[in-house]
Amino acid sequence: VNIGSDEIKDIVCGGINLEEGMRVAVSCPGAVVRWHGEGEPVVIKNSKLRGVESFGMICASDEIGLGELFPSETEGEILDLSAFDVPAGTSLANALDMNDVLLEIDNKSMTNRPDLWGHYGIAREIAALYNLPLAKIEPFRADVQSDFKVEIEDPDRCTRYIGVEMSGVAVKPAPYKMQNRIWKVGMRPINALVDITNYVMLATGNPTHAFDADNITDHIVVRHAGEGEKLLLLNDKELELNADDLVITDSEGAVALAGVMGGAKDLILPKTERVILEVANFEATGIRR
């Protein structure tokens, strides 16, 4: 294995997908990893494996804390970094653009400032305080024709609901730059459609969601839940709702808990070809509760 400056090291590896010329993550002696992503962290040492001296470890993604960003398709799969065109020996943090400084802001200190609940709002505040230029988000208007309808039964709890129907979509991974940014702030990349909604939510602080339109019956209604009404969420948790809960429904029942989480009925799947993108303004107190 070339680990930089044309330094070649013998490393014993049993990865099922390993092949010549593949770019991989190597932990050299002294590095700390989690063996197969489980148990206590271990320190890598020079060792003899299968009668061969091994000078490090070729890593799977979950062994170095990257399992959510680079999920393995099968057990025993090595992290394939061939898509990253960097010289051998480049630190993984530099190769994967992970040398960011993360600022953690406790939102309990600004619950009265919904304009600061997204990254752009924080940037705008900093620009105002320090008289700095602020990058502008250019508006975009699409000429979309659709028979899709939305009804809001409680305009006090939902002041605005925008739904855009799109067809002919293909469910693919989001660009790495978007996946990386989402992962850095504690969210798991899923696919381009879901990641886009989460990315926009993080940027603007505004709830967004994507529905599989083929699983929405008739039209969307924003209403209060019925007492004892059931909703199966996309994390497979079933909720028993009460009349204070605000839900997104179709003609058959609740499909999402407004501003919180979507339901299992209409989640985005690899076969999804038609979607409804939701952007809404929900009353904050109810969402927080």
Residue spans for each PLM region:
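Conserved mixed alpha/beta core segments that line enzyme active sites in large multi-domain catalysts
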Residues: 1-12, 197-265
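Conserved phosphate/anionic-ligand binding catalytic regions in large, soluble enzymes, centered on
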Residues: 15-23, 111-131, 186-210, 252-272
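Structural motif
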Residues: 9-10, 23-25, 55-57, 102-103, ...
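Glycine/proline-enriched, intrinsically flexible loops and inter-domain linkers
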Residues: 130, 134-229
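Solvent-exposed alpha-helices and their adjacent loops that cap or buttress functional pockets
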Residues: 16-19, 50-51, 94-98, 127, ...
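Phosphate-backbone binding interfaces of nucleic-acid-interacting proteins
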Residues: 1-140, 276
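Conserved catalytic alpha/beta cores of large enzymes that bind or transform nucleotide phosphates
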Residues: 62-63, 71, 80-83, 171-172, ...
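Short acidic, glycine/serine/threonine-rich loops at helix termini
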Residues: 35-42, 69-72, 116-120, 145-148, ...
